[in-house]
């Protein structure tokens, strides 16, 4: 997004993560703006959005990317743990979306990108709250489009597949069962790379997507296209 000309503003509840992000971007020669923010706090969101639009620029593009996951079987999960995930992963985008959309409505344009997941479509053991939130985010994306498309605001989602990141590095090794599973389960035959998401994000943030609304683009190497195949099948 920065390479395409966007001014980057990053929010996080953890100041140390913001400092790390600022350094990472600075090492690439990119200046970013950072603000400490809890996306589940509606009053704080309203104050921070107003501050950003005063200190930086009106927000033309919003990427809802905050998220947490708790890997707990349903029978062992407490209701409060379930609510915590929904609060960040679903209520957070709702609060951020409606707060930023007010200005977009006044200006008559805007782009909102909600980071969904393959779990918007599929279930998996121990991630019931995350899957419920991401499934809800898919439908929230469609409802935002239903209400705001008339104001020339495009609201779409991106559903990443399994990506090669620092977090997945420990299991992305030859011989690891999950690594072998992902490679065989993905028609593209590999893990996604961070740069694989860039084109989709830039497209959804640009005028090229002005008539695309309420869609979730799955960047997953084809996982959702197939039931998969037995391990002994070529």
Where are these regions (language model features)?
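Short, small/polar-rich loop/turn modules that mediate ligand/substrate recognition or access, typified
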Residues: 63, 149, 154, 212-214
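Active-site loop immediately N-terminal to the catalytic Tyr-X3-Lys motif
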Residues: 72-75, 122-128, 150-151, 189, ...
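Residue(s) in the substrate-gating loop at a strand-loop-helix junction
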Residues: 117
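Active-site helix of classical SDR
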Residues: 97, 133, 141
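Alpha-helical segment proximal to the catalytic Tyr-Lys
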Residues: 102, 146-150, 210
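Short C-terminal tail/terminal secondary-structure segment
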Residues: 122, 202, 213-234
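Substrate-binding pocket helix/loop in short-chain dehydrogenase/reductase
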Residues: 73-74, 81-86, 182
